[in-house]
Amino acid sequence: MSLLGRIAEKTSRLSCLRLMSVYPTHYVEPIVQKYKQLEQKNDLSKLYHVPIKAAVNKSSDTIFHDDTKHKMINYITKKGNSALARTLLSKTLELIKRTQTEHMNLAKGEKTTINTNPETLLKQAVENCRPLLQVTAIKRGGVTYQVPVPITTKRSYFLAMKWLLEAAREKERKVSLPEKLAWEILDAAHGQGRVIKRKDDLHRLCESNRAYAHYRWS
């Protein structure tokens, strides 16, 4: 991994902290899911006298809730039509399931290595598409430099899902969005495709401008 990549990885934990947070730093995150409470029941006694943050509105303890799917639905939604967005994502996951099941049935070797869980493949695709760095324009002495800076965890997930949707929307009129999005997710989950290339191009741009990294603090 490059030097800039290591710097971004070390600062990833600090990057997600808000400068104007409502809660002080000694407040701990709430445990909403009941199965996680059962897993950590031996450690709950340590939290009796520790202040805990309030759970966010979107939190849910149902086993069917998935943060990645929830965020993807929000990014797909247009003009407040979230029902259509949920339908499109459901069709996308169904196509991924059918495609992977077909590959597994046609495989002659070890079939257990083929992942047929569409939700797992969606998470893997988003993780593979997350950038570590981005460039920002900083002007020094009348010259504008493209300075590489670490990217926050929240924005890295946003860019990964945004790039997947942009790649899916660049399609022919005869191809539906769920079909094209399923292709992009499968490609990204296997470390290939246009979105992976876009992330690599951004990292190469950051690497080529690493000489200007000190302008971030000046």
From Swiss-Prot:
**Residue ranges crossing the lipid bilayer per the database entry:** none
Give the transit peptide, as a residue range. Answer: 1-19
What gene is this protein a product of?
Answer: mRpS7
Per the record, the major location class is mitochondrion
Q: Mitochondrion: present as a keyword of the record?
A: yes
What keywords were assigned to this record?
Mitochondrion, Ribonucleoprotein, Ribosomal protein, Transit peptide
Tell me which Pfam families the record gives.
Answer: Ribosomal_S7
One term under GO cellular component: ribosome
GO MF, one annotated term: structural constituent of ribosome
Please name the taxonomic classification of the source.
Eukaryota, Metazoa, Ecdysozoa, Arthropoda, Hexapoda
Q: Where in or outside the cell is it found?
A: Mitochondrion
Single biological process term from Gene Ontology: ribosomal small subunit assembly
Q: How does it assemble?
A: Component of the mitochondrial ribosome small subunit (28S) which comprises a 12S rRNA and about 30 distinct proteins.
UniProt xrefs under SUPFAM superfamilies: Ribosomal protein S7
- Name under which the protein is recorded: Small ribosomal subunit protein uS7m
